[in-house]
């Protein structure tokens, strides 16, 4: 959400709809979906737990959206904390992108996360190394790092990317 032009949080009137969740959830939020280079649901002002919203509601919402055939892709960006509800979301997903970095700590944290899920389906799980820098050691390839996964794609470090706008990032080689 950092790179979006409109970072205004989701409307407070939608919070109760996420707290309850029903068969009209997608219909209720559809008019609040924004469009920049892609369509997205605005971010929440605070964490969803602060609103007493179950993370499982996003699995439910994704299933509702998927049934409409309106979108080719439904992307749900989460933090790295694992929970049963995130496990359920992963189970329901057609594709799962796991983003890591090339340092030993990132390999360790990714391995810890993988200890909680079955990631044997190589068509479903894609591993991305973000902010890759060739001048630094790539511990993802070291036997000593005990990496439990193989990286499918490397996304090279982009100098000062935090100063770029979304439309500029979309033109960067390797991000298309």
Annotate each predicted stretch with a short phrase.
Residues 106-112, 162-165:
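Short, charged, surface-exposed secondary-structure boundary motifs
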Residues 42-43, 75-77, 96-101, 125-131:
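Conserved beta-strand segments of the P-loop GTPase G domain that flank and frequently precede/overlap
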Residues 83-103:
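Inter-motif core of Ras-like GTPase G domains
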